[in-house]
Amino acid sequence: MFLAIENNLKSYGFKITSKDFKRPWGGFLVIDENQAQEFSNKFFKGLDVNTLKIGGKLSPKILIVKPAVRLSWQYHNRRAEIWQVYKGSTGIIRSNTDAENEMEVYDEGDQIVLQQGERHRLIGLDDYSVVAEIWQHTDKNHPSDEEDITRVQDDFGR
């Protein structure tokens, strides 16, 4: 599944700047930030990336979520995110507090907008799901990175 998605992205002309297929919940591929508009054209129905800029650059990424796993109940201090379900269906829990709400199911083509600091959790359902995401950095002097994560709860003890 992971290599097929990677090859698919390359066939679209995307440059993959990093990847990690060893996460307990699945994995991700990071796309060259200079291709943010092309990424949006392919995965976000051509949404103008200039309308997404909050305080800095944009970082496109693909998440591949294994079936029947939950990512951390988490939030970010230096980014907001916009997601588009690309393949399959996925569960998502969202809240403005540490208390988890009910899971909502999103299908291919559905878009989700997460605010900076909003708690969220992706949940794999019956099959793999692929979610395109764009990080909307909120601090241009200190852009978000993989360390910008506050885990409120994590099934994997991280």
Region locations from a protein language model:
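Conserved short histidine dyad/triad with adjacent acidic residue
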Residues: 44, 61-79
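Short beta-strand His + acidic residue motifs that chelate non-heme Fe in jelly-roll/DSBH
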Residues: 71-74, 83, 92-94, 114, ...
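Glycine- and acidic-residue-biased ligand/ion/polar-headgroup-sensing regions
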Residues: 66-67, 77-97
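A short, N-terminal "cap"/entry segment at the start of jelly-roll beta-barrel domains
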Residues: 1-58, 149-158
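Short, surface-exposed beta-strand-loop junctions and turns on beta-sheet-rich folds
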Residues: 79, 91, 98-100, 129, ...
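Short acidic-glycine-tyrosine-enriched beta hairpin
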Residues: 64, 96-120
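Double-stranded beta-helix
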Residues: 121-158
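Short, surface-exposed coil-to-beta transition loops
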Residues: 58, 78, 116-118
